[in-house]
Each structure stands twice: as structure tokens, then as C-alpha cells.
Amino acid sequence: MRIGVITFPGSLDDRDALRAIRLAGAEPVALWHGDHDLQGVDALVLPGGFSYGDYLRCGAIASLSPIMSEVVEAAGKGMPVLGICNGFQMLAEAILVPGGLIRNDHGNFICHAQRLTVENAETPWTGGFERGQKIVIPLKNGEGSFIASAEELKRLEGEGMVVFRYRGVNPNGSLNDIAGVRNERGNVVGLMPHPEHAVEPGFGPDTDQAMRSGTDGLAFFTSVVRSTLVEA
């Protein structure tokens, strides 16, 4: 299986995503934002960072990159797509997932191990989890507060489109503690925390007393590998 990671000007976590894919047993494929070729990949990752310096709005300029027309088309045909942090912002700007992301309510950049609850384990990216499972994934952003209209929020909650929720203290003012969502079809998932930074043991707090931030993120990538192979 081949999973593409798209690099944009200002991407920071593309190499981490490529490594996570390799550790999950798939072939990572580096893709460039200026191309119109997905190179026959089976799934896509839009990584974190500060694409185009976060000018205008986070993810706004990147969502208009040449390769995004191929991403939108592939997502429409059912290809699994994962947007992480800045990638989530791109997905929202491209209207591939509902809602939007704005400045954290406290106005500060945050970087810590974040406790999450899995709300939907039926997407290609979350099939390795169980609904209600508690996990810890690193979180780092300045504009990660999830917003949506009251009507849209009701639909998200009612149709199971919330995929992850912050557990404990809400770190950025996201409505309903929402950390990640999916599209209606379920193949496109966006979240602010960084699963690609939690794929190997020994990184982050990993004692029984502390929040665990070691390998919880690996399940995102092994899940999509299994899902794609089953469908094949």
C-alpha cells in the first residue's frame, strides 16, 4: 500500500508523517503541492506546519494549491484523506470537512501531550481504536479552536461526525471539546493533534502515573493500511 504525504511551503511535519507511514508497514510517497499528480497512492496525508506562513488564514492559501484539485477529486471518490493540524485547516478551507479553525481562545500557542477520547472508530483512520477509548496525542497549535454554526454543530453531533474530543481541560476553546471531525462519507478526517508524533515508544511521558504519549498515534496509520487492504 502507498500513502502520499503532500509538502507545502512551510510544512514542518511531512517527514514525521512519512516515517509514521513506514512504521505502519506502508510505502510512504512524498508529493509536492505544485504538482497535479498523486502518483497512484491509495491514501493521502496533509501534514502540519505553517503553510505559506499562515498568511490570510491558516490553510487558506494552501487549500488553493494546484494539487488540491486532485485531493478534492480523490476524496470525492472515497480515497482516505487525513488532515493533521495545518492539514485539518486546509481540509476545512477546501470544504472537505465541516467547521473551521480560529485562534485559540486564550491567544497563546500551545504544545503538550493531549488527552483525547475516540468518538468514532468507524473511519479508515480510526478502525484500530474502540469508541470511547482514551488516548494521548501531542498537540501544538496557535489556531486550533474548532468553530461551527449551531445548526452545523447539531448535525455533527447527531450524525456521528465528531471523531475525537478533548478530554479534561479544553485546550483552545473548541466548541463541544471537538478535536477532530470527519466528512459525511467518513473517508476524510481532520484533527488538530499530531498522531505522527506518537508512533514510537519512549517519546513523551510514558509512566503509569503520567499521561501516555508513546504509540497511540500509530493506530491511525495501521488502521488505514488494514482498511485499504480489506477493501482491496
Curated annotation (Swiss-Prot):
GO cellular component terms attached to this protein's record: cytoplasm
Any Pfam family: GATase_5
Subcellular location: Cytoplasm
Signal peptide limits: none
Record-linked Gene3D superfamilies: 3.40.50.880
Any one GO molecular function term: glutaminase activity
One of the GO BP terms on file: 'de novo' IMP biosynthetic process
Presence of keyword Ligase: yes
Domain Glutamine amidotransferase type-1: 2-232
Pathway(s) the chain acts in: Purine metabolism; IMP biosynthesis via de novo pathway; 5-amino-1-(5-phospho-D-ribosyl)imidazole from N(2)-formyl-N(1)-(5-phospho-D-ribosyl)glycinamide: step 1/2
Catalyzed chemical reaction(s): N(2)-formyl-N(1)-(5-phospho-beta-D-ribosyl)glycinamide + L-glutamine + ATP + H2O = 2-formamido-N(1)-(5-O-phospho-beta-D-ribosyl)acetamidine + L-glutamate + ADP + phosphate + H(+); L-glutamine + H2O = L-glutamate + NH4(+)
NCBIfam families, per database record: FGAM_synth_I (TIGR01737), PRK03619.1 (NF002957)
Name of the protein this chain belongs to: Phosphoribosylformylglycinamidine synthase subunit PurQ
Gene source species: Leifsonia xyli subsp. xyli (strain CTCB07)
Higher taxonomy: Bacteria, Bacillati, Actinomycetota, Actinomycetes, Micrococcales
